């Protein structure tokens, strides 16, 4: 193996790890050669009401596409996360919660969590929620967000969690798509010292004339702040649960029954509802959580992701709780009120495993390591990275300053669509290289292909595809199976196309190079450029807009918008700021353009297609080698854009 920047598995980790390198090789070969035998055995890690007899029934044929795992088995996800732990660890802590203000702390045992989930499940049933109904959850990072999810799973309802930073329009589009009759929210959220008007945003979303299905809004009293109230529709959480029974029988669900929807950005049009089912997802989330983080009973596990993202679903809720872990939930942001907060939380709660994002690591790095002078960190054993490729400088800083050079880093690559981690080191098995996601998890078969779909061998670079299914894979786009087929299986026949590019080095390690479609990765969160463009063009003074990502020191990628104004409109700094606020209101703060460049024209082919590769290069200040511009209707547009670019190095 090439030794350049190679970090070997620490001896103490290797000696006690669940999997060493030899075991990894053996298990991986078995998982690929005999997936039915491998997954049939490992699916026993969760409790089945009716055991399955068939393991894998999948087809990647785009004319006849289907994905089924364990499909004749039945189970309940809530029971797997709660009930099965009561006898052996009912009094163990399931959730440690710390508020945005560190003075607010709460510990919830498995027995207490079970009772709360049952009460809320009974309340949902009393409000008329039935098996298969989609319940929309728009909550802050409080214990009750997890309670709401598990209560839905308990009664067979499908939860659709919306990130608490999204705008009323984003909420509305998800409610409409899911036809939700019931919403769950809080009066306000608290994040970074600021109050977020969650109920106010819900009210605004529900005031839209095209939102017609919602009958009930359950509101958690988080801050006690003033809220508008719609009699008959709005109900307080504490009132609907008051007196509700603390036992609730679980609904027996088929392995292929939906567990949740989670909307993710596509390269075109509206966000798509990624549908995950119950059996395969839970097997995969729990198994990856245990093996990737080398989780040992009794350890405190902290995933810093918001519950509104897939990482929060798989590695804050379902994976860890199915494994009987103690999870830490932090309401705020880990660098508020100062960059020292992350270290303080780790020390205060003796966190053993930390799973966070490169964007936070880069933000802490920019503030300086002096903020960690008083950080002990001896409790930390394993650290993870998620959301986007981590640059080697940030990896090393994380390893040295947070991990004190003794914690293995698992740099994990996966997607909302994959349900769980696909390419990752295993702490006791994989020597790591800063910036590389390394090797595939069990049962995962990655390949690199050229633009014609030919498989590339050896050390090379190409489009990242997956050759066969795994249990955690999404099953469809909610209500639009054709979009599922078109998005993931039409580009390269017989393969799942990830939308990412990657290179494979001489050791077979994978390095993710980023999106190859029109999706931007901002602070580890995916945004479709089409969404941001649509928001800009909705403004009366904007004639046309093109949006691309560009390298950003903190966020990984920033949002760079080229805007053509309507005839006669003056391009002013005031208008630029107005457009930034406009997008923020339309989609959410995450989508706010970092840079808006006025453009009298955009580079288009004669057929009118915008050539984004030129825009990406200009935004990245890579102007010396733009490539062939002969297909453009007006090549002079390029010179004008270069001349007025905003992201200059000089």
Swiss-Prot record:
It is an enzyme of class 6 (ligase). Gene3D superfamilies: 3.30.300.30, N-terminal domain of ligase-like (3.40.50.12780). Its cofactor is Mg(2+). Its EC number is 6.2.1.1. The gene is acsA. This is Acetyl-coenzyme A synthetase. Mg(2+) binds at residues 537, 539, 542. Catalyzes the conversion of acetate into acetyl-CoA (AcCoA), an essential intermediate at the junction of anabolic and catabolic pathways. AcsA undergoes a two-step reaction. In the first half reaction, AcsA combines acetate with ATP to form acetyl-adenylate (AcAMP) intermediate. In the second half reaction, it can then transfer the acetyl group from AcAMP to the sulfhydryl group of CoA, forming the product AcCoA.
């Amino acid at each position: 193996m090439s030794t350049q920047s190679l970090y070997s598995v620490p001896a103490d980790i290797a000696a006690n790890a669940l999997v060493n390198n030899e075991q990894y090789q053996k298990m991986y070969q078995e998982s690929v050669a005999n997936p039915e035998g491998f997954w049939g055995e490992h699916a026993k890690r969760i409790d089945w009401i009716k055991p399955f007899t068939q393991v894998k029934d999948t087809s990647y044929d785009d004319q006849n596409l289907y994905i089924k795992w364990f499909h004749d088995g039945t189970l309940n996800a809530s029971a797997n996360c709660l009930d099965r732990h009561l006898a052996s660890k009912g009094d163990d802590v399931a959730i440690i919660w710390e508020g945005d203000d560190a003075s607010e702390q709460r510990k919830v045992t498995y027995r207490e969590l079970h009772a709360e989930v049952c009460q809320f499940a009974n309340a949902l049933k009393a409000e008329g929620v039935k098996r298969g109904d989609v319940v929309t959850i728009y909550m802050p990072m409080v214990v009750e967000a997890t309670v709401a999810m598990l209560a839905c799973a308990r009664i067979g309802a499908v939860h659709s969690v919306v990130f608490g930073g999204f705008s009323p329009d984003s909420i509305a589009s998800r409610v409409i798509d899911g036809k939700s009759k019931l919403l769950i929210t809080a009066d306000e959220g608290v994040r970074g010292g600021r109050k977020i008007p969650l109920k106010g945003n819900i009210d605004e979303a529900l005031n839209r004339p095209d939102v017609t299905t919602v009958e009930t809004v359950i509101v958690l009293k988080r801050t006690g702040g003033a809220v508008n109230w719609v009699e008959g529709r709005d109900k307080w959480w504490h009132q609907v649960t008051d007196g509700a029974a603390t036992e609730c029988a679980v609904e027996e669900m088929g392995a292929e029954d939906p567990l949740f929807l989670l909307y993710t950005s596509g390269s075109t049009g509206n966000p798509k509802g990624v549908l995950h089912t119950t059996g395969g997802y839970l097997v995969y989330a729990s198994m990856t959580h245990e093996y990737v983080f080398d989780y040992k009973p009794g350890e405190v596990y902290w995933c810093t992701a918001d519950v509104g993202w897939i990482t929060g679903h798989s590695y804050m809720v379902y994976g860890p709780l199915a494994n009987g872990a103690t999870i830490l939930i932090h309401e705020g942001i880990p660098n508020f009120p100062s960059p020292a907060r992350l270290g303080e939380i780790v020390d205060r709660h003796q966190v053993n495993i930390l799973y966070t994002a490169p964007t936070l690591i880069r933000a802490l790095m920019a503030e300086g390591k002096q903020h960690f002078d008083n950080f002990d960190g001896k409790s930390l054993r394993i650290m993870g990275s998620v959301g986007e490729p981590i640059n080697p400088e940030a990896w090393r800083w994380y390893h040295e300053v947070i991990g004190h050079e003794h914690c293995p880093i698992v740099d994990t690559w996966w997607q909302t669509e994959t349900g769980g981690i696909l390419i990752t080191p295993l702490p006791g098995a994989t020597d790591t290289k800063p910036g590389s996601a390394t090797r595939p998890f069990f049962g995962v078969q990655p390949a690199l292909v050229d633009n014609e779909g030919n498989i590339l061998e050896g050390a090379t670079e190409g489009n990242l595809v997956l050759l066969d299914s795994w249990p955690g894979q999404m099953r469809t786009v909610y209500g639009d199976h054709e979009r599922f087929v078109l998005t993931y299986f039409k580009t390269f026949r017989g393969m799942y196309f990830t939308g990412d590019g990657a290179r494979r080095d001489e050791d077979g390690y994978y390095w993710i190079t980023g999106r190859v479609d029109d999706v931007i990765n901002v602070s580890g969160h995916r945004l479709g450029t089409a969404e941001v463009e649509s928001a800009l063009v909705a403004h009366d003074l904007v004639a046309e807009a093109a949006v691309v990502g560009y390298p950003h020191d903190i966020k990984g990628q920033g949002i760079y918008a080229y805007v053509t104004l309507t005839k006669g409109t003056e391009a002013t700094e005031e208008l630029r700021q107005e457009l930034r606020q406009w997008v923020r209101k339309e989609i959410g703060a995450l989508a706010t353009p970092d840079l808006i460049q006025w453009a009298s024209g955009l580079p288009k082919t004669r057929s009118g297609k915008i050539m984004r590769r030129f825009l990406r290069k200009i935004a990245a200040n890579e102007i010396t080698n733009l490539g062939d511009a002969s297909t453009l209707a007006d090549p002079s547009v390029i010179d004008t854009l270069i001349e007025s670019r905003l992201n200059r190095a000089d």
